[in-house]
Amino acid sequence: MNYSIRLFKIMGIPIELHITFILFLVVIIGLSIMNNSIFWAVLFILLFVSVVLHELGHSYVAKKYGVKIEKILLLPIGGVAMMDKIPKEGELRIGIAGPLVSFIIGIVLLIVSQFFDININGYPLLYTLSLLNLMLGGFNLIPAFPMDGGRILRAILSKKYGYLKSTKIAANIGKSLALIMLLFGLLSMNIILILVSLFVYFGAEQESRVVEVETIFKNIKAKDIMTPNPVYVTPDMSIEEFLDFMLKHKYFGYPVVENGKLVGCIGIGNIHKKEGTVRDYMEKPVVVSEDTDIKEILRKMANTDRVFVVEGGKLKGIISKTDILRAMSILELKEELKD
């Protein structure tokens, strides 16, 4: 289900409003009407126009590096330019572009407001908007993920410490900052600050994990991490025989092979009765080839505990979540020792 509404396109990039943004806007407008003041509603709308321009700054430079921009999504807590993986060589310039746009808007509005301003309900609109843009640019330059400053910091540090270690440094700063924000948010009962702190924390955590997986599993294929020549069961094996087989080999899931070909898979969670055979309970296996990369393997494992490696119609190996974690631990240690 799509939870966003497309407004228009700029530079070929769709601008979309998330449904929560619309609900938040309705609340802001409602409160403005109740208080006989439209200032905050107008300011809110103009601020998010500024956010769109901020994200377009990132997107414009990113497109120069051949990055595909899916869309810019507006949320109550800000905007997100959803794009393909940013190339390492362009991360510094792409990261700086957004805050630079915000600073330019802020400085221009600040200068203009000294000669001309729009007063609504006694509040100076342009002056207030200029300060918010300067704050937006400054906040995004905080050297912590998922803010732009985190990407800028990583781009600078990666020249000395490597991409993975630099990501972890920026992510840890981001999570530490998020915990401080959460503490202040809870003490002051500030819902917005609490939501922003959660966004920052999980954004930093996600960035760290994604980069860690991409870095340590670079050039790793299914054949490199699979358990080769796995034990298997046959479709005609009784459930009682299967349970004894499972007790002997200590695994929770097994491939089902008939006449040398993989025909299914079965695990402890598939068994509900003692009657019948393996054929009655087996499921369709999720299959990959020996050269399948880790990204595709993880995508296929989203709804299953294991995938089976098949080449030329023959079962070559099995990859379980335990295999993934084991390989990750070993490869992560190799990466750390390399640095």
Swiss-Prot record:
EC number: 3.4.24.-
A Pfam family this chain is assigned to: Peptidase_M50
UniProt-listed PANTHER family: MEMBRANE-ASSOCIATED ZINC METALLOPROTEASE M50B, STAGE IV SPORULATION PROTEIN FB
Protein family (similarity comment): Belongs to the peptidase M50B family.
Transmembrane stretches, start-end: 10-30, 33-53, 96-116, 125-145, 180-200, 251-271
Protein name: Zinc metalloprotease MJ0392
EC class of the enzyme, as a word: hydrolase
Regulation: Inhibited by 1,10-phenanthroline.
Function: A site-2 regulated intramembrane protease (S2P) that cleaves type-2 transmembrane proteins within their membrane-spanning domains; its endogenous substrate is unknown. Regulated intramembrane proteolysis (RIP) occurs when an extracytoplasmic signal triggers a concerted proteolytic cascade to transmit information and elicit cellular responses.
Membrane topology term: Multi-pass membrane protein
Upper taxonomic lineage: Archaea, Methanobacteriati, Methanobacteriota, Methanomada group, Methanococci
Domain of life from the UniProt record: Archaea
GO molecular function, one term: metallopeptidase activity
Sorted UniProt keywords: CBS domain, Cell membrane, Hydrolase, Membrane, Metal-binding, Metalloprotease, Protease, Repeat, Transmembrane, Transmembrane helix, Zinc
Catalytic residues as annotated in Swiss-Prot or TrEMBL: E55
Segments forming domain CBS: 226-281, 281-335
Subcellular location: Cell membrane
Co-factor note (free text): Binds 1 zinc ion per subunit.
InterPro entries: CBS_dom (IPR000644), CBS_dom_sf (IPR046342), Peptidase_M50 (IPR008915), UCP006404_Pept_M50_CBS (IPR016483)
Cofactor dependence: Zn(2+)
Quaternary data: Monomer.
A single GO BP: proteolysis
Cellular compartments per GO CC: plasma membrane
Originating organism: Methanocaldococcus jannaschii (strain ATCC 43067 / DSM 2661 / JAL-1 / JCM 10045 / NBRC 100440) (Methanococcus jannaschii)
Keyword Cytoplasm: no
Residues that, per the record, bind Zn(2+): H54, H58, D148
